A protein has these predicted regions:
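A generic structural signal for short coil/turn motifs at secondary-structure boundaries
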Residues: 17, 67, 258-261
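Short secondary-structure transition/capping segments
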Residues: 104, 210-213, 331
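Alpha-helical cap/lid subdomain in secreted, periplasmic
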Residues: 222-367
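Conserved beta-strand scaffold positions in the cores of enzyme catalytic domains, especially
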Residues: 155, 197-199, 318-320
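Conserved SGNH/GDSL esterase-like catalytic core that processes O-acyl groups on lipids
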Residues: 123-128, 166, 171-263, 295-301, ...
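N-terminal secretory targeting modules
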Residues: 20-156, 160-181, 359-368
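Bacterial Sec-dependent N-terminal signal peptides
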Residues: 1-26
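Residues at the starts of beta-strands that form the adenosine-phosphate
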Residues: 152, 196, 286-288
Length: 368
């Protein structure tokens, strides 16, 4: 009788253990249940990207979630757990090394009775490295993550759009830890409209001339065509993206006019029109584009307005920021770049223009 009881208990233990093991799941980063926003490249089950602001959503039923990844340098990511991107992140994680594992969520199993959704957003830019996600692991099961919004805004920019130094004080120098793309005018404007945001931005880049440099072919006009910020190939194919933006916003020119210099007007205008043509080739001739003029230089306004007026392309709009759009003390972060307060003020300026161009109604939504 004792032997029989032991045998039954052993069978029950094996059954329970098998049940627990059966509920654990590992999926490749390319699994269709994971939702990505931004330019990525899928290869052999892994997903690679380096543009700032790329984000993903993954949903699971279980008590833990980890991700296996590699990074060519060191990046920082915002992590939201059962929350939204208009809130402060629940944690910030660093990605580095080859084939490393990061635990994003862990809670006692008895409390894991519902589905959890994790949002993971790259807060640093391409110069900090390329991240490759290999697989996700949970002790439960994966379910379909939230899909993208019906509204999508594309932003092309420089350090302002990257969120360079947004979390630093105006007396601090830049460090990668203080860069946070989520605290930019771009993300604030997109959130106001309930839109997804796709960002191509790199600090120091211009239309024809980069910061403290000469006229160069390595500029945002060229990089916009690439899948990766840090590599010329492969070329980006919008047809494979799955998302088509409703509007593209360009916020470039500051670096062209940096350190008391600027390119010849004909060179700048030629490159700016080339960027406009690239956008139209991606999304169609009627695709709307909003060209923002930074507040720094009146000559820059003349250059960009000349490009808009002479491009002979439909749906190209113009917005010049006033020098008083934000102040240079309380609204500033590292190295003369706006903090979150300054970025929200820029968002307040651009939102009415996006509303007019797209037909999206203004609302009482907070700008955050």
């Amino acid at each position: 009788m004792a032997n029989r009881i032991i045998g039954v208990l052993a069978a029950v233990a094996v059954f329970l253990l098998g049940g627990l093991q059966a509920r654990s799941e590992t999926i490749p980063a390319t699994d269709a249940r994971v939702s990505y926003i931004g330019r990525t490249l899928s290869d052999n089950g892994s997903v690679s990207f380096d543009w700032t602001g790329v984000y993903l959503k993954v949903r699971f039923e279980g008590s833990s979630l980890s991700i296996r990844l590699s990074d060519s340098k060191k990046n920082y990511y915002n992590v939201w757990i059962d929350s939204s991107m208009d809130k402060a992140p629940d944690q910030v994680v660093a990605t580095f090394g080859n084939d490393s594992t990061i635990t994003l969520f862990s809670t006692p199993r008895r409390k894991a009775k519902q589905a959890h959704q994790i949002i993971l957003q790259k807060r640093t830019e391409g110069s900090q490295g390329r991240t490759t996600f290999h697989e996700f692991v949970t002790d439960g099961v994966f379910v379909q993550a939230d899909g993208p919004s019906e509204r999508v805004i594309e932003f092309i920019g420089d350090s302002y759009t990257c969120g360079y130094g947004t979390e630093a004080s105006n007396k601090e120098r830049f460090s990668p830890e203080t860069e946070n793309q989520n605290l930019t005018y771009a993300c604030a404007a997109a959130r106001y409209f309930g839109a997804e945001h796709i960002v191509m931005a790199h600090s120091g880049m211009g239309i024809a001339r980069n910061y403290n440099g000469k006229v160069t072919e390595d500029n945002m006009t060229a990089r916009y065509l690439n899948t990766f910020d840090s590599a010329e190939s492969p070329a980006w194919k919008p047809s494979e993206a799955g998302l088509k933006p409703d509007i593209t916003v360009i916020y470039l020119g500051t670096n062209d006019f940096s350190t008391g210099m600027q390119p010849a007007q004909r060179v700048f205008v030629k490159n700016y029109i080339q960027l406009l043509k690239e956008i139209k080739e991606f999304y169609g001739e009627e695709h709307p584009v909003l060209c923002m003029v930074p507040k720094h230089d009146i000559l820059m306004l003349e250059y960009i307005k000349k490009a808009v007026d002479t491009c002979s392309l439909p749906g190209v709009h113009f917005l010049a920021l006033s020098p008083s759009v934000h102040n240079n003390e309380e609204d500033m972060g590292a190295d003369g770049h706006p903090n979150y307060s300054g970025h929200k003020k820029i968002a307040y300026t651009v939102i009415p223009c996006i509303s007019t161009i797209t037909g999206w109604e203004l609302s009482t939504n907070p700008i955050q």
